[in-house]
Amino acid sequence: MPKQVDHRERRETIARALWRVVDQRGVQQLTLREVAQEAGISLGQLQHYFASRKAMLTFAMDLAAEQTAERVGQGLRGLGEHPHPREVLRVMLLETLPLHPDARATSRMSAAYVLEALHDEDVRTRARGGLLEGRALVEHLLRQAVADGHLAADRDPAVETGLLLALTGFTTLLELGAVTAEEVVAAVDSHLDRLFGGG
């Protein structure tokens, strides 16, 4: 059992090194050699854990998704036992956007994965599956909100899901300094207020 933990730990260390390469030097520098150097190990050692760039990138993306889910879970626990769906969606949206260092690292990892997905069918299928899963979760929350009377019955959950997910488009604007974090949070809050009848 300890060997498995060590193996997972080493893979996570390599994945975090990959995040740093993406964050500090860009996707174009994302090679096995570059990541090995960043992780402080030899190329051979890295290849013991990841046979290919794609395997390494996929694991790093899975870890980024896990980290985001953990942050969302932590935020949701802070809302108490029966949080309003508006607050649940707010936590989910804000933790997806690069508003703080941890979210920025996972967001940049996601961007690297999307670029890879454009040219690799396997990666595209996997990435698309994750996005569809996220979309289904948001739509389920909205359908439940309608059923519970938190959201007007004339709201179309599928359309509203699309509009909520469109807010993640702030990622590019934030990364390029076209908007501030405060402006993004205000826009998210304004949209949620209108959606749930508070504005």
Predicted regions and their residues:
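C-terminal peripheral helix-coil segments that are non-catalytic and often amphipathic
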Residues: 1, 91-93, 97-98, 135-136, ...
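Residues in soluble alpha-helical coiled-coils and helical-bundle/repeat scaffolds
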Residues: 51-55, 80, 101, 105, ...
